[in-house]
Amino acid sequence: MPTGTHKRLPPGRSARTAAALVAAALALALTSALAAPPKRAAPPYSFAIVSGVIDVPADEPAAQRLFESIARERNLAFVVYAGDIKGAKEACRDSLYTQRGAILDASRVPLVFIPGHDDWVTCNTAAGGGYDPVERLDFLRQTLLADAALPDPGALQITRESEVARFRPYRENARWMHDDVVYVALNAPAPNNHYLTAGGRNGEFEDRIIANGFWIDHAAEYAKRREARAMVVIFEGDPQFDRYERAERFAWLRFNRPRIRDGFRELKRTLVKAAATFRGPILVMHASNAPLATGFLIDRPLHADDGVLVGNVTRVAIGPRHPANQWVKVSVSPARQTIFNVSLQDVPKNLPIPPTLPVVPRDDVPLPQMPEIPALPALPDSSSVAPPLQGDGTTPGGASWPAPPPASGPAPGLPASSVQGTP
């Protein structure tokens, strides 16, 4: 038989063979469909975000009522306390932190605490007790941010940046995932991200922006690998998105008109990079510098260095007029086109005050000032030092808002609208 020719089958046998092949293909397709059912959409849930609830000791009972009101909300998964468990005029004593920590621990809903500027930045003032801010931040890391003595089966499965050897101090930077949405907690306080304009070296600031940049980069890559539905980044300080420093061609001509350096510059550029890595919706939430009329603000203010709008990043600034009696609720519906719905909730006036917690004895003796944490060595690109994601990437142990356009080219799977506000 010549090369390239085939033996012809009888007409009847050819038809029977074709029918058998079609039947086998259908059976294989049916078996595959039964073996790998489509992924079920996650059910809707919500989370609460609060900030600056306690300013003076008299606010403590109201804070307890606030957390009790939040706990009574149906399908509420967790609470994020975005900074300031104390006021600027309160001394940063150990006993005060212990007292406020007990209020957070009493929450019946899992709670994630992010330090704010009054929690450590303003501790060096006379009203704050004249403490070293870096030492007070380290104290918070060892107490309020420490692991529980006993494992809590109902707690969130949180990954902390301190698990990375190079960033051991940064326990406050955290990441967790809930029903296809990745959440990131970050230490970026007001004002101006604790950038110091006085003479000397900004050691704490310089080291922290490296750690923060690494953590956002890694979270974006994590969300991409897990094919997350969305990503939420939460911190305390207002990054002033309308102020975006760009390289100036003749900056040396401005020597007689100095300006304050933008302490959030690196954070904003890291968010631009994260939006290019993870093309799904990214929600950035932070506390407002002043109370807002509706309790929150939704906009899309992030631009790249070339001025192009980063379309998949939406900002939600929270600023209730009465922080001790109002909280911001974010409803999450991963299966819907509009993933997030933001609303302001009031604590019912008839809600009873929970039992008073034991008062921690006052300690008026400040701790000795600690030396500043030494600078971290220069790091390579974060993609080369990111810790490996375990297996499939799991963690260890109203007014409608228009759809955000893509940052650079179409973003596959980007919903027409991802955030909605309810007045």
Regions found by a protein language model. Name each.
Residues 91, 96-211, 215, 298-331:
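Extended active-site neighborhood of metal-dependent phosphoesterases/phosphodiesterases
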Residues 18-31:
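Bacterial N-terminal signal peptides
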Residues 38-41, 71-78, 177, 183-184, ...:
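His/acidic metal-ligating clusters that form di-metal
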Residues 289-423:
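Binuclear metal-dependent phosphoesterase catalytic core
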Residues 34-96, 228:
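N-terminal active-site segment of His-dependent metallophosphoesterases
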